[in-house]
Amino acid sequence: PGTCSCLRHGENYDDNSCLRDIGSGGKYAEPVFECNVLCRCSDHCRNRVVQKGLQFHFQVFKTHKKGWGLRTLEFIPKGRFVCEYAGEVLGFSEVQRRIHLQTKSDSNYIIAIREHVYNGQVMETFVDPTYIGNIGRFLNHSCEPNLLMIPVRIDSMVPKLALFAAKDIVPEEELSYDYSGRYLNLT
C-alpha cells in the first residue's frame, strides 16, 4: 500500500503496529494522532491501530490481594496496543460531584490525564469506567508496570486513553500501569 499523506509529519507506528518511540527510556511519549474519517487512506493504513480495537486475548481473573485483575493469554511485543481505558468522559464539576458522593467503601476508577499543550496550558481529560467501560477497568496499579498510557486522538480532540506494552509481555502475565501517570516511577 502507498504511504498515507497523514504520515508526512511523522509516523506513530512501525510496520508491526508497534508504537514507534515510547521515548527516552520509556519516560515520555509524543502526541499520537491516528488517521480519521477525514483521511483518504484505507482501513489498512498503518496509522490506524487503536481504532481497530483489541488484537489479543485476555482474561479477567481474581488476584490474591487486589481484587479483579486482567492478564494476557498470549505474547504481546513491546510497543503494541493492548487496550483502551474506556468509560464516560466527564467534566471537572461532574468528577467532583461523583467523588463527593462516594463512601469510604466505594471504589474510585476515575482517571485524570493531564497534557501540557502550549504556553504552560494544561488540557485535562477525565474518564470514569464505573458504569460504562471495558476490560481496561480491571487493570491494577504497579510501580513497575508493563503498560504505558498514551492519549490517542482519532476523530475528536478528546483522546482515547490507549495502553501500550512498555515491554515484552508473556502469556499469563498480569497487565498493569502506574495510576500516577508516571512510568517506572521516573519523574
Where are these predicted regions, by residue range?
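Active-site-adjacent structural elements in folded domains
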Residues: 19-21, 158-161
